[in-house]
Structures are given as structure tokens and as C-alpha cells.
Amino acid sequence: MADQNREVKKSWESKVIQTHRVFPGDINSHRTLFGGRLMSYIDDTASISASRHSRSDVVTASMDTLDFLHPLNENHSVCIESYVTGVGSTSMEVFCKIMGEDLSSGERYLAATSFITFVAVAKEKGKKQLVPLVEPSTKEEKFVCEGYEARKAQRMSSRSFHEQFAQTITDQLPWSN
């Protein structure tokens, strides 16, 4: 199916916003949010954006980048905003903006950014689930979407490297000779 026949959705149609308080059980030895917990929040939020855009089940193909910019302290809130920023035929890139807020002062800050790639899963085994094209609306969406092709090219280059790398990694148990 040619691109001109594909449905087009606005980035904002896939937008998801999820907010959590950083509780004592969520923190590491530095008294900041444990990175793995944030990764889980990001993947959860981004997967909803991808499903909302494609109206299908999705799987996480890769967490392409996660840049930690500012620690999220205990009793602050963490707000993840995600939306689709680029698509292939069955894949979708989702951008996540992670904002922190000091709930005592109201100070807000950019804590992290992330790009994740998802693949739409067809209901019928062996079929491909074509995803709609995406069109940005806001200044931020346009800025982020404009970089999609460059990020995709970088992912493809990295993917080739990692596929070759994985072929040389042993699957033997570490305690066997």
C-alpha cells in the first residue's frame, strides 16, 4: 500500500501523560528514583501511545535512547509524556519527555528524554500490521518529528552492528568449560 493511501494521524492523538509520586520504595541508595523503575514507567506509557496510534497490540523493539538529565528525588513527582514521532510500515518511534516536580515548591524540571521503537502486531499470524502515518502539530512535535529520519538511520546502523555482535556472544553457561 502506497503512503498516499495510508491513514494519517496527528501526533497529539497518541499522546499519553502518566504521573507518579516517587515513594521511598522507588528510590536507590542516592535517594533518587531507581533508573529501572523509570524505564518501566517509560515503556508502559510509550506502549500506550504506540497502541493508541496503531490501534493494535504492540511489542517493544528497542529502547533506543534514555538520557538522564536531572535526578528525580524522593517525594517529587515524575510525569511521563509520550507521543508517536515517526513511523515505518509496521514500526513506530515514540518520544518520551520526563518531567520532575518538587511537590513542596512547585519547581518543574526536565529529568530525562527517551526514544523507543515499537512494532505493531497483526491479529492474524504471519500478516503485517501497517501503521498510520504521523503528522506533528505543535512546535515541539514538529521539532522532534523532523529528526526522525536521522534517528532511524542511526538505529539501522546500530542494529546491524548489534546483530553481528550477538552472533559472537556465547550461550554457554559461565561455569562450564
Regions found by a protein language model. Give the residues of each.
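HotDog/MaoC-like acyl-thioester-processing domains
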Residues: D3-Q18, N73-E74, T85-N177
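Long, compositionally biased, intrinsically disordered segments
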Residues: K15-I17, L33-F34, Y41, V58, ...
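N-terminal leader/targeting segments and the first structural element of proteins
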Residues: T19, F23, R52-A61, D67, ...
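A conserved, well-ordered hydrophobic junction motif at loop->secondary-structure transitions
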Residues: G25-Y41, Q172-N177
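Short histidine-centered beta-strand/loop micro-motifs
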Residues: S29-T32, P71, E107-R108
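Active-site helix/loop of acyl-thioester processing domains in fatty-acid/polyketide metabolism
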Residues: R37-R55
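Conserved interaction-surface patches within small, structured recognition/assembly domains
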Residues: V59-P71, S77-T85, G100
